[in-house]
């Protein structure tokens, strides 16, 4: 009703940007004739203006808004010259939304990557840095190489953060004007910086502005999982193994929904991902273990048993994890990608290792942690892009204070979303999907099937193999991950069938007829990389294009001489290329490689540099480099030959109706379903989508409840007969909304609890940073001492009693425990003084004693006292903060139980957590002052060794 009266608020928001777009389009006439030199000079001109107002954030904000039209016009022109891509008007609007610190919802294929160049250029002009955040290393690297060329052309430095980089490389890249990185690298670097022992180890500078690509994936899907840096803790692995054996013998209850007592040893709450032992279960577990109490504090077993049952019932192989190289590797439930190096905490990972019979890794203790919610709120200005944000608009606004604005598409969508079809059983559904794939494949239409787990993608693959239908599989299995970008590049070709696990955020567009540009780059890499990349340096390659081959003769730069690991060949699978190359194209490729070897030397470049040469050659940026010119000539010829085939295929595929997307199960989130749908019909292409569902699907089973069970009995139909029912569809959407609300509540709870930790984290990290930078360390230690003296006085003097009853002797002894240099202090010196006067007197005595201590230490080595101060403060902060994190975790678990006693667990957590924090700060102060006075380096030893 409001929309009818006031008009769509989104339309109003977009409308206010229209005059700016008109202004930019008018400026284009002035900027187009500029020479490259004059265009580049614009950056320096903008920077000069911004330097004058850098002291005032308000003035800087105002000036950036003033510069926006011209800066965007400059970026549009530079992009046209370097990449051959001109920003559409709607992309300009997207850039403005991002500059205003909002979320821009843009459909798949509308060029989000190009949009990000606009606000990142404008916000980097201040010299304070801009971060472009992506979901994985491959996308960060692709965007840094591809879009980075435009920024570099305009005189900005571009940095890239990748896994495995050294601290020096990281610092250099963070100091660039624009830095491309993944959310996890940024978060972990922040935590590591706050564990640094010396200021030189800190790699990040203060945050300024960030654009997050796939913002919903990072700020919502990953918000339930905090980033954790942990250290190892020794726990006996026999307990995990024994618990796993016991869990295997315990029986799951089958009558959990009825009013009767549960019949098994434990109940499983799939919705809450939890397990509960029944009374009989406790008795059986205790008997099997031969113990009298699972909760015995001297020999606790409950934690191990609960985790072992969770591993058995809730953590499924090839769905939640895969086993690779004798290790358990987690599979991300939203992207379907493996997450090597990530481990479940709290002993869960060990329980799964025990279940699978692989080596049990040591359990870990949290050293530092932060949630993505609180990490990204550290940025003064934050923005994001995604194809689907409107469904989570409320959460973005409440948690992050980010508005969502939908950017109009450049061309009208021609995608048809067909109604869902529902089958009675899961097997009936899969057979129908395989039949649909066969039919469409025979017609020549490309098909993309989205599955929710590795296991299901492999089951469908088996069904298609039985029917002899060629297809590509894209899931978390390592052999498939390696070819990810290749598979996506040809998913739009005539008759292609692609099965993908959770397609969201796959980063490469599906182009009808096939992606000639990407295939041409792949061909270039095949020739170029083996001859140019140094042998030590086939380090972290782009996921999806590295092939491994062991059988080539070593003389060709391949093979595995002396039994070493197989060398990378960069060889793509032969069936990806749409055509055989002409002799002319092959000659050009060989000539480019020969010139490269002659110029740089054979196998002499790092992989990053070699990749960068190809990326530059594949664009249009002017270059004087003869090697790039040769490579470009070869690339253009190869692309031309491939395009002759792909353009023809594209016309045929468009005629047939474009890409058809099949969803095989409704995801827990409507947004992920919409992302899958968005793969079809990009940039005005035709396309269609349909979801195939069954009454046995998880979502309906867990959240649909009894209504679905009744429906199942009501439908006395064959398993391969589709059911179309409005009630079913409504039931499904209701289930999805329920799940979304449920997960939103979990994220909200994670956020609220971490908010308590966040205030403490900020305080402790600020204190730590002050110490690292060495600012007034002596004054800080003396303040610690003065606070300690005050606390001793307050603890030993009761102001309600007459002064002759004060135990001054005890007070003086306590002071001497901390400051042994005050051994001459006597109780009678404090007689006749008020508590305040005693405090002032002790402050003076402390300062005298500290100066004396400093003189003693600096005789051994000048400046040693400052080093000792830094060392002891950092040591105490780190040790006690680590213990505090454990105490807060234990507190969080215990307050959860207080909800039963009508108390608000969050309020209890806040107040008790605050008390714990104050206790920790007191302990830090006391331990530091005690350590400083007890510090006694020996002159004959090398003094540094004492403190570093």
UniProtKB/Swiss-Prot annotation:
SUPFAM superfamilies per record: Helical scaffold and wing domains of SecA, P-loop containing nucleoside triphosphate hydrolases, Pre-protein crosslinking domain of SecA
Gene Ontology annotations of biological process type: intracellular protein transmembrane transport; protein import; protein targeting; protein transport by the Sec complex
GO terms, molecular function: ATP binding; protein-exporting ATPase activity
Compartments, record wording: Cell inner membrane; Cellular thylakoid membrane; Cytoplasm
Pfam families per UniProt: P-loop_SecA, SecA_DEAD, SecA_PP_bind, SecA_SW
EC number per UniProt: 7.4.2.8
A Gene Ontology cellular-component term: cell envelope Sec protein transport complex
Keyword annotations of the record: ATP-binding, Cell inner membrane, Cell membrane, Cytoplasm, Membrane, Nucleotide-binding, Protein transport, Thylakoid, Translocase, Translocation, Transport
Protein residues bound to ATP: 91, 109-113, 509
Membrane topology, from the record: Peripheral membrane protein
EC category name: translocase
Chemical reaction(s) catalysed: ATP + H2O + cellular proteinSide 1 = ADP + phosphate + cellular proteinSide 2
Annotated HAMAP family: SecA
NCBIfam families: secA
UniProt cross-references to PANTHER family, sorted A to Z: CHLOROPLAST PROTEIN-TRANSPORTING ATPASE, SECA INNER MEMBRANE COMPONENT OF SEC PROTEIN SECRETION SYSTEM
Family: Belongs to the SecA family.
Designated name of the protein: Protein translocase subunit SecA
Protein's organism: Synechococcus elongatus (strain ATCC 33912 / PCC 7942 / FACHB-805) (Anacystis nidulans R2)
């Amino acid at each position: 009703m409001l929309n009818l009266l006031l008009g769509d608020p989104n339309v109003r928001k977009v409308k206010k940007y229209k005059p700016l777009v008109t202004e930019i389009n008018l400026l284009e006439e002035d900027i187009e004739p500029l020479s490259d030199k004059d265009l580049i000079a614009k950056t320096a001109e903008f920077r000069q203006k911004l330097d004058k107002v850098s002291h005032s954030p308000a003035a800087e904000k105002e000036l950036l808004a003033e510069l926006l039209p011209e800066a965007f016009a400059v970026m549009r022109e530079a992009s046209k010259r370097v990449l051959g891509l001109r920003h559409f008007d709607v992309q300009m609007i997207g850039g403005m939304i991002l500059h205003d610190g909002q979320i821009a919802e843009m459909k798949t294929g509308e060029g989000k990557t190009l949009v990000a160049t606009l606000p990142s250029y404008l916000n980097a002009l201040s010299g304070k840095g801009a971060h472009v955040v992506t979901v994985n290393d491959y996308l960060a690297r692709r965007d840094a190489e591809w879009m980075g060329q435009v920024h570099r052309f305009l005189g900005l430095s571009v940095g890239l953060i990748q896994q495995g980089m050294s601290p020096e490389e990281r610092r250099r890249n963070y100091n660039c004007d624009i830095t491309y990185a993944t959310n996890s690298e940024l978060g972990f670097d922040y935590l590591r910086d706050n564990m640094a022992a010396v200021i030189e180890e800190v790699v990040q500078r203060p945050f300024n502005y960030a654009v997050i690509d796939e913002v919903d994936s990072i700020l919502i899907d990953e918000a339930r999982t905090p980033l954790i840096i942990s250290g190892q803790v020794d726990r006996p692995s026999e307990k995990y193994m024994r618990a796993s054996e016991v869990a295997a013998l315990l029986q799951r209850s089958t009558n959990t929904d009825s009013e009767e007592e549960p019949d098994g040893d434990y109940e499983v709450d799939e919705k809450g991902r939890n397990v509960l032992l029944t009374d009989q279960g406790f008795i059986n577990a205790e008997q099997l273990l031969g113990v009298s109490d699972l909760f015995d504090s001297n020999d606790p077993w409950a934690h191990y048993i609960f985790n072992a049952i969770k591993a058995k019932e809730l953590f499924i192989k090839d769905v939640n994890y895969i086993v690779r190289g004798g290790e358990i590797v987690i599979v991300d439930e939203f992207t379907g990608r493996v997450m090597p190096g990530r481990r479940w905490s709290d002993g869960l990972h060990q329980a799964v290792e025990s279940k699978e019979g692989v080596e049990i890794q040591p359990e870990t203790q949290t050293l530092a942690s932060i949630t993505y919610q609180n990490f990204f709120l550290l940025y003064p200005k934050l923005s994001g892009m995604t194809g689907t944000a409107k469904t989570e608009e409320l959460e973005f606004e409440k948690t992050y204070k980010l508005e969502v604005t939908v950017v109009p598409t450049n061309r009208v969508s021609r995608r048809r979303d067909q109604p869902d079809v529902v089958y009675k059983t899961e097997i009936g559904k899969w057979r129908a999907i395989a039949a649909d794939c066969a039919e469409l494949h025979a017609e020549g239409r490309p098909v993309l099937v989205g599955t929710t787990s590795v296991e299901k993608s492999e089951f469908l693959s088996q069904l298609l193999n039985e029917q002899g239908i060629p297809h590509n599989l894209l899931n978390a299995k390592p052999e498939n991950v390696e070819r990810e970008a290749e598979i996506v590049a040809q998913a739009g070709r005539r008759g292609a069938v692609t099965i993908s696990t959770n397609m969201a955020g796959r980063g490469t567009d599906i182009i009808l007829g096939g992606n000639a540009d990407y295939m041409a780059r792949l061909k270039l890499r095949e020739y170029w990389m083996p001859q140019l990349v140094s042998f030590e340096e086939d380090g972290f390659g782009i996921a999806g294009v590295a092939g491994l081959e062991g059988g080539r003769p070593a003389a060709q730069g391949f093979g595995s001489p002396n039994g070493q690991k197989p060398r990378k060949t960069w060889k793509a699978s032969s069936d990806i290329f749409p055509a055989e190359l002409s002799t002319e194209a092959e000659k050009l490729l060989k000539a480019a490689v020969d010139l490269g070897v002659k110029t740089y030397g054979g196998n002499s470049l790092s992989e990053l540099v070699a990749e960068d040469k190809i990326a530059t050659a594949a664009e249009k940026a002017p270059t004087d480099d003869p090697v790039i010119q040769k490579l470009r000539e070869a690339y253009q010829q190869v692309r031309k030959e491939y395009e002759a085939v792909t353009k023809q295929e594209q016309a045929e595929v468009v005629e047939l109706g474009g890409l058809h997307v099949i969803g095989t199960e409704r995801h827990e989130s409507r947004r992920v379903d919409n992302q899958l749908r968005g793969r079809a019909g990009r940039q005005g292409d035709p396309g269609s989508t349909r979801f195939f569902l069954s009454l046995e699907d998880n979502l309906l089973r867990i959240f649909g409840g009894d209504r679905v069970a009744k429906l199942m009995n009501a439908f006395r139909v064959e398993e391969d007969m589709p059911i179309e029912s409005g009630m079913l569809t409504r039931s499904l959407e209701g289930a999805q909304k329920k799940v979304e609300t449920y997960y939103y509540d979990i994220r909200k709870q994670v956020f609220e609890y971490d908010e308590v930790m966040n205030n403490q984290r900020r305080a402790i990290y600020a204190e730590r940073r002050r110490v690292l930078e060495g600012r007034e360390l002596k004054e800080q230690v003396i303040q610690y001492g003065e606070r300690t003296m005050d606390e001793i006085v307050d603890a030993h003097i009761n102001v309600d009693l007459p002064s002759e009853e004060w135990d001054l002797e005890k007070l003086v002894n306590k002071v001497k425990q901390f400051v042994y240099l005050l051994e001459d202090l006597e109780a009678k010196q404090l007689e006749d003084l008020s508590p305040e006067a005693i405090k002032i007197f002790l402050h003076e005595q402390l300062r005298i004693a500290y100066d004396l201590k400093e003189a003693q230490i600096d005789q051994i080595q000048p400046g040693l006292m400052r080093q000792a101060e830094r060392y002891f403060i950092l040591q105490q902060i780190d040790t006690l903060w680590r213990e505090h994190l454990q105490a807060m975790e234990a507190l969080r678990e215990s307050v959860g139980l207080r909800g039963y006693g009508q108390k608000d667990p969050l309020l209890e957590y806040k107040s008790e957590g605050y008390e714990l924090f104050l206790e920790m700060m007191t302990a830090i102060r006391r331990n530091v002052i005690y350590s400083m006075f007890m510090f006694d380096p020996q002159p004959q030893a090398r003094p540094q060794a004492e403190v570093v």
